[in-house]
Amino acid sequence: MGRLAVTAAALLVVAWQFSPRTMVGAQLSAPPPPDEQYDDPPMDGLPLSPPPPGEIDSPASPLPDSPPPPEPETREPTPPAPTQPQQPWQAPLPPKREPAPPRTVVPPQEPVWSSAPPPPARVVNYTATGCTTMLVFGDSTVDPGNNNRLQTAAKANFLPYGMNFLGGRPTGRFSDGRLITDILAEKLGIARSIPGFRDPRLRSGQLRRGVSFASAGAGYDEATARRSNALSFTSQIEDLWRYKRNLQRLVGPRSAERLVRKATFVISAGTTDLLFHYLASNQSASGSGPQYENQLITRIANYTQVMATLGGRRFVFIGVPPIGCLPLVRTLLGTGTTRCHENMNLLATSFNEKLVQVVRRLKNEPDIRATFVDIYTTIGKATIDPNNFGLTETSRGCCGTGIIEIGQTCRGRKTCTHPSKYMYWDAAHHTERMNQIITDDVMNSIGEIYV
């Protein structure tokens, strides 16, 4: 891990791209054009009002057997944030002992990434299960443009982002086209895409089908979002409360409660935490990796408890990818385009294993259905044998040089001729084609939450 400490300064340079200080003197981007044509009326009269105290229960509260009675409309103060650890975890000092020989860490072996294409998706009648709504939380992997009106540099509402999206116009998605959640929503028969909750052009019909609260630059750690002035996970859960109140005004309290309880909650985050907070803070050199991962896992459990209190019952947790294979990481940590960074992949593997344990515990909760989506393996297969997936380039992105550009540094850059042959769109995010490949595996994983 010594090399990680040496390159921490380089990662800080990348994090600077997402710093709100880079926005001094800049004009806020205009709201993106609508990504589809809708016949529903705009959401007039549905303000974003803060939830009253007590509406968002403590993470320690038991799951309610029935929805709580609606609060009076006159109560509008700011909600208490979900419980956070009071102070960073500190491991106890070990007893003095003779130094042990160096421990050899064995990275994941490539044979576990079988080159065989994924099996066909499991056939489930999702319409019969009442799957009509999707609610999304997380980072840039599932942000459809919530950051567009924030004072942050973590935006993608400019070309070449979105050049292959519906209508061929940028919306704020960090891809050339649709995200995993957009494609998943279409496969579930919900909608062709999932809009951002903070999109000023959001329509009432879209509200019923679901929204994304995700924000590029966010993570499970609140400090991660502060670094880029993104919407923290706490803010996203507050937006869930506002969404629910708006939904009640549209369809009534009982119908709104039923929609939320049957909704698919998709959560995709963690990569930003591990990259732009964990490494840039130089914590890797101090050996505090497991402690930091444990803090993230504790927060995930707390956030999920709050979402369940607000009505969530079906949860899809998308794991982190092999982050050592991201073109950006290959460049900054010096492995180049020939190989992935093994230690970074070990971090991702360790985090995913702990997230799986959270999902297993959630399954033991009454009325809760949860599943983990292993995108690490899917991306690993495509990395070692891209031809089986119709890809030709897996080590660099389509935008610019493909080895460093992300967000603002991708603005206006030339792109590759055939993005559908590339795994990565920029140096950290996938093309729509790769998102389609990943979504096929997602469909294989989520059937259990609908039976």
Language model: regions and residue ranges:
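Intrinsically disordered, low-complexity, repeat-rich polar/charged segments
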Residues: 53-65, 72-75, 83
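Conserved active-site regions of diverse hydrolases
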Residues: 2-45, 53-55, 73, 86-88, ...
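Conserved positions within tandem-repeat grammars
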Residues: 65-66, 77, 91, 97-99
